[in-house]
Amino acid sequence: MSDLFEDPAPSRNTPEFTVSELSGAVKRVIEGEFGLVRVRGEIGRVSRPASGHLYFDLKDDRAVMAAICWKGQAGRLSVRPEEGMEVVATGRMTTFPGQSKYQIIVEDMAPAGAGALMAMLEKRRAALAAEGLFDAARKHPLPFLPRVIGVVTSPSGAVIRDILHRLRDRFPSHVLIWPVAVQGEKCAPEVAAAIRGFNALPEGGPIPRPDLLIVARGGGSLEDLWGFNEEIVVRAAAESRIPLISAVGHETDTTLIDHAADRRAPTPTAAAEMAVPVRLELLAGLDGQVARLSRCAAETIRRRDQRLRDLARALPRLESLVAGPSQRFDLWSGRLSGALGQSVAARRARLEPLGAHLRPRLLADLVARQKDRLGDRTRSLETCLGRRAERARDRFDALSARLAPAFARLIAETERATRRDAATLGTLAARLDAAPEARLARLSDRLEALDRLRQTLGYRETLKRGYAVVRADGAVLTTKAEAGAAAMLEIEFQDGRLSVGRGKTRKPKEEPPAQGSLL
């Protein structure tokens, strides 16, 4: 019975290992048997320590495997590992003897199918929308007529050719192309750098700053367009101070940059159509506005002129206004002559008695006294004026000393302004002199073109090709009946005219009777 509870003695032929030796042997077997493998599973328990390495689990409904992605490789992963995401990890199997567990060193990672990509895309879209990156309040209006357009796309391919062709057809503009990769690992960082690079250009620098940006790419699968779903691209588009049009893929393709852009275009060609209007339509609209303005101005002038005529007819005639005052003037002028004579006679009669009382001596004394008083006043006034003039001269000298620098600056500024105005006037004069000559040249070219068209469409060019014009009594004949009724015909050829008299009408030759049938 005791044998049932005792372990059998180990065989002396079984090899003996230390723990380290056995762990190393297991490590060599696993690394040799499972070199490079691809493992599909759900990510769980993601850890990102300060070292930069990435630790997580790959699991399914029956097993869990530890996974490691070193710092240098973690930054190059196309997918950012998140808990709950289903992925396919590519890497090499190994063991960690310190904890007696096996694990996979991940070198690459991709979502497990389109469903996983769509789930990750929706989760990322919701997170970015919660931050307000897709709010309508952040959108910028597109400029009506941008001078410079920046295009972020691949420099080769049909996309850039379609955009340039459409811009050239609608309204030629200055286009700056920032070449980027439009798929793959380099796509997202290069597109984000291009958007930020255009925004960093200074106003008035050697490279003109665009007024509008177009981010464009042709159609493709969800994986091909994934670079435009990356968070770095979406944030760069949302932060752009320059209005941005997203034209990624076809009309059915939707990426996250479409939500962050100020406007989404279904195709790159449509983006070019959104960017600029049609130049010919603008010119036609401008011509229509000018024509309407001219008609409105002419109608306004006509109505004002008619109103003036109506008011003029309502006013009284000038002769009727002047007739009454003129008659009164004649009446009063006759009366005034007699009244003046009577007034002079009455005043002379009053002055004659007074003149007898006036003596020359009294007048001379009065004049002498007034002259002495005037001399005293003059001397006093001269003294006072001298003192006031001296004080005024002192104040004037002080003010002159204070105002001299200001006058000097004013004179200098006036001279500079005069030189600038003279330069501006010279430029305007040159432009004014050149404008009539340019207009005269354009009108001359148009006149020559119309003259060539007149010569081409004239009937004399037709005569050179063998035709002739038939006239009778100065009128052109167009039918056989008119020619038969005319007595004299005049035929015009290329080199002159020929008169032809009507000859004797020949009787048409009768056709022989048809031979009857012998049967």
Swiss-Prot record:
GO terms for molecular function: exodeoxyribonuclease VII activity; nucleic acid binding. Pfam families: Exonuc_VII_L, tRNA_anti_2. GO terms for biological process: DNA catabolic process. Residues 500-519 are annotated as: Disordered. Its EC number is 3.1.11.6. It is found in: Cytoplasm. The keyword DNA-binding does not apply. Keywords: Cytoplasm, Exonuclease, Hydrolase, Nuclease. Bidirectionally degrades single-stranded DNA into large acid-insoluble oligonucleotides, which are then degraded further into small acid-soluble oligonucleotides. HAMAP family: Exonuc_7_L. NCBIfam families: xseA. Belongs to the XseA family. Heterooligomer composed of large and small subunits. PANTHER family: EXODEOXYRIBONUCLEASE 7 LARGE SUBUNIT. This is Exodeoxyribonuclease 7 large subunit. The gene is xseA.
